[in-house]
Amino acid sequence: MRSALLTALSAITFLSAQAQYGTFDPKAIATAKTTTTLIVLDAGDSPYNRTIQEAVKAHWKFTKSFDFITVNDLATAPMMPEKTYLLKTKKTDAEKHDGYFLTLVQGWKQKKGEVINVENNAVTNLPPAQELAFLMIDPATVSGTGAPMLNVYVKCMQDYLKQVESGKIKDKATADRIVDILEESFAAMEMVMLPREAELAAARAEGGGA
């Protein structure tokens, strides 16, 4: 669990360096709040599907309603302006390093012939203008020992949106303050989870590794 927490914290640090969190437009946030959010799940069953559904059902408050679809549905149904989408995206930087993100997207009217490309259950050609908020993730971690971090990601994303709408976040400088808040959240979670992890490890040892 400690490695999962450190991975998540490293992701937030990287995100700060990239200075990319999403929109700074309060009007875009206000419009998005009136939509229904479609939570895009992996194709087929996966640990990610189960954990993101649990996280959304427990913590999603940004829009009044949400529903679940699979990434395969993006290929058969066009994006809709009256919907927002919580999905995984993949970005590649100038040095050809790939990064995966949990991204909230404002739907739009696709142009004729415009196709949504998907790789490893993540959209690879999302128009940057449609991004409302995003956080870097490690797909393997959030599908394994770091699954509980999805709850934190969902909460932090909504906190960002709330602060943009209220005008507290207006640009890169004010957005960077989020990093301090997230670091405190991860530190607090680590204090709670690490003792529990030690207890479980001791129990497994006593039980012969079961």
Cite the ranges covered by each PLM segment.
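Bacterial Sec-dependent N-terminal signal peptides
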Residues: M1-D25
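Cofactor- and metal-binding active-site motifs of prokaryotic enzymes
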Residues: L74-A140
